[in-house]
C-alpha cells in the first residue's frame, strides 16, 4: 500500500511557521484517502490550498494551521522515525 508523509504546523501571516509541528506517515490507497485518515485522527477539517501533483497544501478554516502532504518513499519513512504511523 502506498505511503504518504504529512506535516501539520501553525501559520503566521498565511505562511507555515513551524513553531510546532506534527509529522505523520500514512498508509492509504490514494492521497485523498490519506487526507481523510488524517482528518479522522486529528479532528481538523482541511481545505485544499494548492496542488502541484505530488505535493499538496491544505489549510484549516478559521485557524492558523496548515498541512503539507506528499508521496513518501522509503528514505522519508526512514528519516522520520518519530512520525506517528496511521
Q: Where are the regions that the model predicts?
A:
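A short, charged, amphipathic alpha-helix used as a generic interaction element across diverse proteins
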Residues: 29-53
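Intrinsic-disorder-associated interaction segments
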Residues: 1, 27-31, 58
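Generic structural motif
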Residues: 9-11, 29-31, 63, 72-74
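Short, mixed-charge low-complexity intrinsically disordered segments
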Residues: 44-86
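Short aromatic-glycine-(Arg/Gly/Cys) micro-motifs in beta-strand/loop hairpins
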Residues: 1-21
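A short, exposed loop/beta-hairpin motif centered on an aromatic-Gly-Thr core
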Residues: 17-32
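Hydrophobic beta-strand residues in large extracellular and virion-surface proteins
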Residues: 4-6, 26, 34, 38, ...
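Short intrinsically disordered coil segments
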Residues: 21-24, 39-43, 84-85
Amino acid at each position: 500500500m502506498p505511503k504518504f508523509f504529512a506535516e501539520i504546523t501553525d501559520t503566521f501571516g498565511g505562511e507555515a511557521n513551524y513553531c510546532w509541528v506534527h509529522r505523520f506517515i500514512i498508509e492509504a490507497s490514494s492521497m485523498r484517502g490519506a487526507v481523510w485518515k488524517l482528518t479522522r485522527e486529528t479532528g481538523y477539517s482541511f481545505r485544499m490550498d494548492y496542488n502541484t501533483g505530488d505535493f499538496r497544501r491544505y489549510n484549516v478554516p478559521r485557524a492558523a494551521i496548515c498541512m503539507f502532504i506528499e508521496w513518501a518513499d522509503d528514505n522519508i519513512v526512514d528519516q522520520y522515525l518519530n512520525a506517528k504511523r496511521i
